């Protein structure tokens, strides 16, 4: 399985299908003032105009209700074209990933930028298994919710609370911290989701059983009985 040819090739810049020069800056005229803005080429899809300096240069801001024409950041992870029905992760069509890759393989792809080898996947799965348990105090956190609370806000609240129990990986500028927090979230979300469901139906929580893989473990914690 291979990504779409050319994905991630930032050197392939020319003209788009509207004939716009993808290498040129953009000149914006506001009254008598002309402001030059940078053009940010896209590896696929539409290019963008860099308006980050617009306020300083021209004293104005952009207005784009709903951010219909605004990209919040550049991304090498996801490409979406809703009108054309296209969704790609790291260059791979979502249909291809759904048919040929497991949940953990796609998770690895999103985090590290490439599909894992068999050894890398095994190591990744083992690492996730070391983080499936919840701190016991976080487990008791669920007791504060009414039984008829919808599982989604319960899950969202528990996820927000995780950082108060795991304060050794909170620096967003430290790649090691980001990686550890990502692994923890992947490992603990199935446990949190299962606990939220068990709370809603009045059944006792089940601890993770790491003899199972991630998906089997989630099903066990969600639907199993003591």
Regions from the PLM with identified roles:
Residues 6-21:
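Short, Lys/Arg-enriched N-terminal segments with co-localized hydrophobic residues
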Residues 23-226:
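Hydrophobic alpha-helical bundle cores within soluble ligand-binding/oligomerization subdomains
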